[in-house]
From Swiss-Prot:
Main location: cytoplasm
PROSITE patterns: ENGC_GTPASE, G_CP
Gene label: rsgA
Protein name as annotated: Small ribosomal subunit biogenesis GTPase RsgA
Assembly: Monomer. Associates with 30S ribosomal subunit, binds 16S rRNA.
Keyword set, alphabetical order: Cytoplasm, GTP-binding, Hydrolase, Metal-binding, Nucleotide-binding, Ribosome biogenesis, RNA-binding, rRNA-binding, Zinc
Amino acid sequence: MLQAIGWPWPGPPADSAWQAMCAMYSQCRPARVIEQHRSGYVVAEAPEVPIKVESLPAWQRRSFPPHERAVVGDWVLLDGRRIVALLPRRTVIKRLAAGEHYRQQLIAANLDTAFIVCGLDGDFNPRRIERYCVLIASGGVEPVVVLTKVDLCVDVAAAVAVLREHSSQALAVVAVDARKAEPVVALYPWLLPGRTVALLGSSGAGKSTLTNTLLGEQRMKVGEVRQRDSRGRHTTTHRALLPLPSGACLIDTPGMRELKFTGEEDLVEEFADIELLATQCRFRDCAHQAEPGCAVRAAIGCGTLDPQRLHHYFKLRGEIVGAADRSMLRRY
């Protein structure tokens, strides 16, 4: 029954690190974290069979690093109703938590795909989607853009074209009416049995509506959206893993207002075109400003690279370097 909640193998784990952990705790059994609350965790060993469990004592200490605690999507080992170990993560999406101090916040773990849900209304922001893609791809997860509220957009094809201009990778973009089952069929290639998908996006983007459609029932509360800024209230208040009729698992998440980098990200996937051009520069330490033999500047000069794309590349790279510096200072 573990396969029905995303266990990645047909039998015992094939990963050597997982094998070692399971052998070390041979009397324990694996389970998946399906809900995370301030008071503790809810796990499952089979679909629709939630178990409220005690976490490791170390996790309850305020000084314990938050990113080392379990998060929705994690696999743990249980002894009765007590978590005794956290299995190594295959993938993870994380961001820098809001506030002055450096603190990582995990969004979800052990994902195959993340749907970036964006409404084709005032919520549509290609630069923010680009930022999502960097966070997601850096965690080893495949990003897929899901455009909702197609009834509010005069030219959906033009919106899709704009997104493709802002991405150098083969980014999948799917436009759907999240309220109807038929268009959502287009998402099924990412919802195969055993796969895990997370929904990310702003409040009011249509994540809960899409979740209800994929579930085939009205389980998630849907909120109204303010017309002046196309933002909604947080109808999803905590992360939860839900088995879908297709055999996949869906992680619904609260709306995300801030997307700060942790300093561990890279831009290789989202800005592959610029990274490739940089390898062709005359100088290895080229800053792509006014150096002779700069392939990046040459691409701008001949019109094959958008100057705004390079500007955003510099902006994101600066944020990542700044976050990495804050992380280093925190260690000393």
